[in-house]
Curated annotation (Swiss-Prot):
Keywords from the named record: Endoplasmic reticulum, ER-Golgi transport, Golgi apparatus, Phosphoprotein, Transport
GO biological process, one term: vesicle tethering
Sequence similarity: Belongs to the TRAPP small subunits family. BET3 subfamily.
Function: May play a role in vesicular transport from endoplasmic reticulum to Golgi.
Residues where Phosphoserine is found: S10
Origin: domain of life: Eukaryota
Subcellular location: Golgi apparatus, cis-Golgi network; Endoplasmic reticulum
Transmembrane segments: none
Gene name of the record: TRAPPC5
Protein name: Trafficking protein particle complex subunit 5
Organism encoding this protein: Homo sapiens
Cysteines paired by S-S bonds: none
Keyword Lyase attached: no
């Protein structure tokens, strides 16, 4: 009876707590996310409502993702500039969620408050089939909610929406106070 408890240490017990293994089965993720979309779809009457419900769920996830990333980061420093926060989202947050960086980060030519994160083939839309009557549905609204929460909880309040353009584009529109603060920091 005691022989089963006297084996050598398990590889699981040897892992460091600071950097847990973050891989999730793609099929498990696809199943859970499609069930989440179906659950939300059964409780709404329009595509806009469905996208806002997915964004609200994404905001809940985003707050927790930010907490986890900040807790794991060694020598964590708080970003004070908009570009630094956006690069954190494009790099560290995207890697933690999807295993790779986002494809592109761009700023709008005509508006200093607007930035775009472009993902050509978003993982979140890969296994979702959309009927023709809901052709405007973009399930990346969930990702937009995550990004909005990460930025807002980092001290950069913004509104993030998902659009179909060059794949999926997340449009990030910061509040005017954020841009004014960024300009004031540049002047120092």
């Amino acid at each position: 009876m005691e022989a089963r408890f006297t084996r050598g240490k398990s590889a699981l017990l040897e892992r460091a707590l600071a950097r847990p293994r973050t891989e999730v089965s793609l099929s498990a993720f696809a199943l859970l996310f499609s069930e989440l979309v179906q659950h939300c779809q059964s409780r709404v009457f329009s595509v806009a409502e469905l996208q806002s419900r997915l964004a609200a769920l994404g905001r809940q996830v985003g707050a927790r993702v930010l907490d986890a990333l900040v807790a794991r980061e060694k020598g964590a420093r708080r970003e004070t500039k908009v570009l630094g926060a956006l690069l954190f989202v494009k790099g560290a947050v995207w890697k933690a969620l999807f295993g790779k960086e986002a494809d592109k980060l761009e700023q709008a030519n005509d508006d200093a408050r607007t930035f775009y994160i472009i993902e050509r083939e978003p993982l979140i839309n890969t296994y979702i089939s959309v009927p023709k009557e809901n052709s405007t549905l973009n399930c990346a609204s969930f990702t937009a909610g995550i990004v909005e929460a990460v930025l807002t909880h980092s001290g950069f309040p913004a509104k993030v929406t998902a659009h179909w353009h060059k794949g999926t584009t997340l449009m990030i529109k910061f509040e005017e106070a954020v841009i004014a603060r960024d300009r004031a920091l540049e002047g120092r």
